[in-house]
Amino acid sequence: CCTVGDIRAKVMLKSKAGECDLVVIDYLHLLSSVRQKNETLDQVVGRNVTALKQLSLEADCPVLLVSQMNRACETRPDKAHVPVMSDLRDSGTIEQVADCVVFVYRPEKHGITKDERTGENLVGVGKLYIVKNRNGATGIARFRYNPSYTKITNYCNTVTS
């Protein structure tokens, strides 16, 4: 894999040439880092997140950073397993530094195929939980997905065949 320094060098070159519109890193925990003596994984991840935020500011280019979650949401007593901010794996720094935090959630993946409150069929329905948005609103956005094609489309409550 590569380091934040490797990414920084490439992004700054592209940025100076006016060719940097978005940086996507999939995913945070695969970034290589030299771990200092007595440094925790949380601290290493935090250092990388902070460096990527600084890069975003310097290059004037957004960074979309994909991160793994811990397993806490899977052990909650409610069967929905809806993610919350503290589910971000190995770093409270993500919560502090990120401008926006969005969780992708698919009820069907947890065996939930019908909304108990509304009766809506949830097969092929996903939700984006916008749990932090420094420059806008938070909330839930629905989408449709087709796992056969890994295709995401706009949400419409009426499904046509």
Residue ranges and their predicted role:
Residues L31-S32:
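Catalytic P-loop NTPase motifs of RecA-like helicase/translocase cores
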Residues Y27:
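Walker B catalytic acidic pair
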Residues C2-V23, Q36-E39, R47-A59, R71-S161:
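C-terminal regions of RecA-like/P-loop NTPase motor modules
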Residues D42:
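Donor nucleotide-sugar recognition loop
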